[in-house]
């Protein structure tokens, strides 16, 4: 009962923060808007300059893919942490003890800033999973590929399955973890979207546990389609690993729903899918 009451109080505080941030959208003066744009410009300038230098290092290390992965994680820790610090965003991290072992880390995706959190917090020896078209993203796509992260071909089911088999082979041979956004795209309003099945297929083949990584408030710190970054409190919460050793192919839909429901229960009302509030209590 006490745990439920604490969760309810936390959700109310987060909802108040969401309402306040929405109201602030109409109050921002020109100075705050320009300051926010300036911060974004500075951050992207830093990313651009360092990405070029890091890309050259990655080219030199082409014969050593595992070293590229580890150094790519190090680059992400430095740049991701620097960007978060420059934005001045207050952060609370919970459950970091659940990141000590190999796993498939999954995260909800509601803001452009989520990518920097993933870069900053991914354990050393972790590869990202993205659609194969990421290689065409200017500079960062090429850096992603050079860092030996995994690209999934989603053009048809057969290609996707083959891509996932290759992903499992890589992480098994190199003793790596995975990190990915199971929604497959970014939410427009911060509310949780349906999950794709890819992360479950990867868990079935690799037998790695799944560690949910729940981001709360990022959609208020940097809203999709805007150039305004706000110092809104953000919580990063890791849940205990979910064992997948006894999972079977015939229950894939059940596993997807189970983990999606875990997110619904742990997100504040402002980030739950519409119509899910009562079901998640």
UniProtKB/Swiss-Prot annotation:
Residue ranges of the TM segments: 40-60, 71-91, 110-130
Alphabetical list of InterPro entries matching this protein: AGP_acyltrans (IPR004552), Plipid/glycerol_acylTrfase (IPR002123)
Domain of life: Eukaryota
Motif segment (HXXXXD motif): 109-114
UniProt GO molecular function: 1-acylglycerol-3-phosphate O-acyltransferase activity
Gene Ontology biological-process entries: CDP-diacylglycerol biosynthetic process; phosphatidic acid biosynthetic process
Protein name as annotated: 1-acyl-sn-glycerol-3-phosphate acyltransferase
């Amino acid at each position: 009962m006490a745990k439920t009451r604490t969760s309810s109080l936390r959700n109310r505080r987060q909802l108040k923060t969401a309402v306040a941030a929405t109201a602030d959208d109409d109050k921002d003066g020109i100075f705050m808007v320009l300051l926010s744009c300036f911060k974004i410009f500075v951050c992207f300038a830093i990313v651009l300059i360092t990405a070029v230098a890091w890309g050259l290092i990655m080219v030199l290390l082409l014969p050593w893919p595992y070293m590229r992965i580890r150094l790519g994680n190090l680059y992400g820790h430095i740049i991701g942490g620097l960007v978060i610090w420059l934005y001045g965003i207050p952060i609370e991290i919970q459950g970091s003890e659940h990141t000590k072992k190999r796993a498939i880390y999954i995260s909800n995706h509601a803001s452009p800033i989520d990518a920097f959190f993933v870069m900053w917090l991914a354990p050393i020896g972790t590869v990202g999973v993205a659609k194969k078209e990421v290689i065409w993203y200017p500079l960062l796509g090429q850096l992603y590929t050079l860092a030996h992260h995994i690209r999934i071909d989603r053009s048809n089911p057969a290609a996707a399955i083959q891509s996932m088999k290759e992903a499992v082979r890589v992480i098994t041979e190199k003793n790596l973890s995975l990190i990915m956004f199971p929604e497959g795209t970014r939410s427009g309003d911060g509310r949780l979207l349906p999950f794709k099945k890819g992360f479950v297929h990867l868990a079935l083949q690799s037998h790695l546990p799944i560690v949910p990584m729940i981001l709360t408030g990022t959609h208020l710190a940097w809203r999709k389609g805007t150039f305004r970054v706000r110092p809104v409190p953000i919580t990063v919460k890791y849940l205990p690993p979910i064992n997948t050793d006894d999972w079977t192919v015939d229950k894939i839909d059940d596993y997807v729903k189970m983990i999606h429901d875990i997110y619904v229960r742990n997100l504040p009302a402002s980030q739950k899918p519409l119509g899910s509030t009562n079901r998640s209590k």
